A protein has these predicted regions:
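Conserved "HGTGT" condensation-loop signature of ketosynthase/thiolase-family condensing enzymes
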Residues: 1-192, 202, 206-213, 217-369
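Active-site-adjacent substructure of cysteine-protease-like catalytic cores
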Residues: 198
Length: 369
């Protein structure tokens, strides 16, 4: 095209020179105009290319920033979950065939009393050793107690104050009012101090009129900084949970897409635990599939975990139990969790230490520290 333009300009200049009988040096004018235009186009092209490269670099930096934000994690140092006999944690986790039941199971009561208060010595006894182990880490301990009401909290507080003294552990004990916000604060402040324990126990008020299967869960968290500096054991990492609004379908689909793009980038999901009705669970999994999430369909292990058919009816607040079961489920590496609260789906990912994502986490810790 440019050569054609040059030829046309040269022919036009030649006609003018012959017609007006002027100096043949005027034939160089088209060449100069053509060269200037070509140079201008070259400079413009280079500027556009540089701008495009700069924009691609900026987009890449933005994506990396959001990916780093979405994949920021805290450390799960330890966990312990107990269920009443004859329930078996492995059977509940793997959803073993033949393990389904509709019965309710309770912890033993002290002195054959039915009230729930007579059951807490049995439960607390199971966590005495876990509380004792915290003394080995030589870190400030904060125990956050999840209880259905103030009376239950005060009973647990008294019991744990006693066993903390016996175990030689200096612990600050407080009620857990908003665990979702608390974990969000821990993730945001990756250098928060000390060890934080979430303890959740649900016992029926009257064993003779039980409403759910009883359970108790112990989750020990620390910051990546504290875990590295104090050489704490790392059982898994908990990736930043997010809240997805359930009231706006368009915003919900967009949020699932962003979660797939950033939080689950380059990751395969091995299991999903949603404390939600089955219809809602299938909907969430479907939206994640549509968003491009990669699923590991290993038929030897369940992809969608629903503990309730194997434990019997669970209490309304069973999400800490879900995290406890996930922590024990080390055979599946990247595990999604989600529960409904206040019109939102609170969703995150627990990553066990034998996964590639865990290696990525260690690299991140080295950079941070």
């Amino acid at each position: 095209v440019w050569l054609t333009v040059l030829a046309l300009l040269f022919i036009a200049a030649l006609i003018v020179v012959l017609w007006l009988k002027i100096s043949p040096f005027y034939l160089l004018i088209p060449v100069g105009v053509w060269g200037a235009a070509l140079l201008y186009r070259f400079i413009l092209s280079m500027n556009r290319s540089a701008a495009a490269d700069a924009w691609e670099t900026e987009k890449s930096n933005i994506r990396k920033k959001w990916t780093d934000w979405a994949q920021r994690s805290i450390v799960l140092v330890d966990s312990h979950t107990i269920l009443p006999e004859p329930l078996s944690l492995p059977d509940v986790i793997t959803q073993a065939s033949g393990g389904r039941n509709a019965d309710l199971f309770l912890f033993p009561r002290d002195e054959d009393e039915d009230l729930w208060r007579s059951g807490y010595p049995y439960v607390a006894e199971h966590f005495y050793q876990k509380l004792s182990e915290l003394a080995e880490y030589r870190q400030p301990v904060t125990l956050h107690i999840d209880a259905p009401d103030e009376e239950a909290y005060l009973n647990w507080q008294q019991r744990f104050e006693e066993i903390a003294e016996m175990a030689g552990v200096r612990a600050t004990i407080k009620p857990l009012s908003d665990g979702e916000s608390l974990m969000g604060d821990w993730v945001e402040n990756r250098q928060f101090e000390g060890i934080h324990v979430i303890f959740s126990a649900w016992l029926n008020e009257d064993a003779s009129d039980a409403e759910f299967t009883e359970n108790a869960t112990w989750l020990v968290f620390a910051s990546p900084y504290a875990a590295k500096q104090n050489k704490l054991p790392v059982k898994a990492v908990l990736q930043r949970p997010i809240a997805i609004s359930l009231s706006d379908e368009t915003a919900q689909n967009k949020a699932f897409g962003h979660y797939a793009d950033y939080a689950l980038k380059n990751r395969t999901v091995h299991a999903a635990w949603f404390t939600a009705p089955p219809k809602d669970t299938q909907q969430y999994v479907g939206k994640l599939r549509q968003a491009g999430v990669s699923w590991n369909d290993n038929f030897d292990l369940p992809l969608i975990h629903t503990p309730e058919p194997y434990t019997g009816q669970l209490p309304r607040e069973s999400h800490w139990l879900t995290l406890g079961l996930m922590a024990e489920n080390s055979d599946q590496q990247n595990q999604l969790f989600g529960w409904q609260k206040d019109g939102n789906l609170y969703m995150g990912c627990l990553i066990h230490q034998n996964s590639v994502a865990y290696a990525d986490y260690l690299i991140t810790v080295r950079k941070v520290v």
